[in-house]
Amino acid sequence: MAKPCGVRLSGEARKQVDAFRQNLFQEAEDFLCTFLPRKIISLSQLLQEDSLNVADLSSLRAPLDIPIPDPPPKDDEMETEQEKKEVPKCGFLPGNEKLLALLALVKPEVWTLKEKCILVITWIQHLIPKIEDGNDFGVAIQEKVLERVNAVKTKVEAFQTAISKYFSERGDAVAKASKDTHVMDYRALVHERDEAAYGALRAMVLDLRAFYAELHHIISSNLEKIVNPKGEEKPSMY
């Protein structure tokens, strides 16, 4: 029977791995002790901003510089295709500046939470002990916490997809409104997309704050088992 092959690192490689672990544990400690509480407070303050408390959603509407064609006169009904008047073309159509400004605030927050989830996942994975017989209750807790953090990360990734989808759907609506300029419903659809996006962005910030609060609760409540799953040593972040 072949002997198991152990993984051996050179002295320099071992130093680099150890340095990475130490930096990882330090980042995790800073995240839990400093970053998390401050982020919950800062998101609460962001939710109090006027930009996230718009009562009249119609005020969010961006002007659509799309000319509305005049109705054809009765004597034009029998004219040939060559004789028909051209539909006036629209020029440059910018995005909704109010929504773009709000996106500039929310998008970095989404990215930050995703990166922090990756940090926590990597940290806990480095704390999982050698698999062997014995008391694995602490390991089970580590796995449960990892499962929940991964779930949060998945939801945050869905936020990123939703932001991209907003631009795609709004772009389609604007394209239709500029092509079929006589159909007012397409213009209304553009405004509807903006109003829906505003509500979604506010909900995102609420969810981001809730996710941070959940991470703080689930990690702090189970910190002893996370950092010391076997209960053999004094619990430590390191």
Curated annotation (Swiss-Prot):
It comes from Rattus norvegicus (Rat). This is Proteasome activator complex subunit 2. GO terms for cellular component: cytoplasm; nucleoplasm; proteasome activator complex. PANTHER family: PROTEASOME ACTIVATOR COMPLEX SUBUNIT 2, PROTEASOME REGULATOR PA28. GO terms for molecular function: endopeptidase activator activity; identical protein binding. Induction: By interferon gamma. Heterodimer of PSME1 and PSME2, which forms a hexameric ring. The modification N-acetylalanine is found at A2. Transmembrane segments: none annotated. Implicated in immunoproteasome assembly and required for efficient antigen processing. The PA28 activator complex enhances the generation of class I binding peptides by altering the cleavage pattern of the proteasome. The modification Phosphoserine is found at S10. The lineage of its organism: Eukaryota, Metazoa, Chordata, Craniata, Vertebrata. Keywords: Acetylation, Phosphoprotein, Proteasome.
